[in-house]
Amino acid sequence: MVIRVYIASSSGSVAVKKRQQAIVGFLEANRISFEEVDITMLEDQRLWMYQKIPDEKRPEKGNPLPPQIFNGEDYCGDYEDFFQSKETNTVFSFLRLPSVKDSES
């Protein structure tokens, strides 16, 4: 499975840009393989992302904002979920990846 981070390269929101950078930077720094999917350039990917986000993670109005994280077809979460996993040191579990300890044994 591959980690996919759905981003918006042309977002006018500074908060969205910072959140995207935080996730991408963390993944790069920890050498976690991932793909960036730009939903502003790929309409079919944007629609796919919207369809795969669980109802409980959708806003009352509008569409879910990037960044959104998937492992293959499995929804991992949004920035808030990612941030929480960083705080609790459970990023590998959040991303549905084997932990570093598991891969060393």
UniProtKB/Swiss-Prot annotation:
Please list the GO terms describing molecular function. Answer: SH3 domain binding
Q: Does the keyword Flavoprotein apply?
A: no
* Organism superkingdom: Eukaryota
Primary location recorded for the protein, binned into one broad class:
nucleus
| Listed CDD domains | GRX_SH3BGR
Q: Which family does it belong to?
A: Belongs to the SH3BGR family.
Q: Report the protein name in the record.
A: SH3 domain-binding glutamic acid-rich-like protein 2
Q: Which gene encodes it?
A: sh3bgrl2
